[in-house]
Amino acid sequence: MKNKIFKYIFILIFICSCKISKQRLPYFDSYDFSPKWNSVDHKIPKFQLINQNGDTITNNDYTGKIYIADFFFTTCPGICPKLTKHMKILEDLYSNNDQIKFLSHTVMPWHDSVSVLNEYGKRYDIESEKWNLVTGEKEEIYRVARDGYFADKSFKAQESANEFIHTENFYLI
C-alpha cells in the first residue's frame, strides 16, 4: 500500500514539475552583460553586405534560422584565429542542420576584400553555403555591430564613431 502511495506521489510530482512555462529571454546591451528585459522584440538592423564569394547577403538570408555571428579581421594576430577555429568546430558539428548558419563580419572592410575573405575561408575550410564571411561599408558594419549586437562595449555616444571594434564574443541569434 505504501509503495502505491509513493508511486502516485512521485508521478504527481513528476507531472507538476513538467509544467511548461514561457519566459522571455533577456538580451544584453551593456559591456558588463547585465540583462535588459525588453517588452519590444529586439531585431538586428537591416544590412546588405558582400560575402567571400561576392554574393550579396542580407537579413533575409538568415530569416527563420538560428545563427551565430561574430566580428573579426583576417590579419588579427590574437583572438580571431581562435574564434574562427571554434566557429569551424560548430560549423562541422551542425553541418547537416539546415536551420543553423554562421555569419562573420570583418571589422576591417578597407583591408578584408572579397578575395581576402575568400582566401581566409579556404585557409579555415569554411563551407560557404552555411557560413558567410562578410565585408561592406565600414559605417554599415559598425552600425550593425553597435545597434544590433551591442558588440562595442566601449562605445559611448560622445566618442568617435571611428573607434575600432574588436570583440571576442559569439552572438547567438
Describe each PLM feature range.
Residues 1-46, 50:
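N-terminal targeting signals for export/organelle localization
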Residues 14, 45, 58, 72, ...:
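Conserved Rossmann-like nucleotide-binding pocket used by diverse enzymes
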Residues 44-45, 67, 167-168:
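Short loop/turn microsegments at loop-to-beta-strand junctions
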Residues 51-52, 173:
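Short, acidic, Ser/Thr-enriched surface-loop or helix-capping motifs
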Residues 59-87:
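Short active-site neighborhood of thiol/selenol oxidoreductases, capturing the structured segment around
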Residues 84-144:
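Structural microenvironment flanking redox-active thiols in thiol-disulfide oxidoreductases
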Residues 138-173:
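Thiol/disulfide oxidoreductase modules built on the thioredoxin-like
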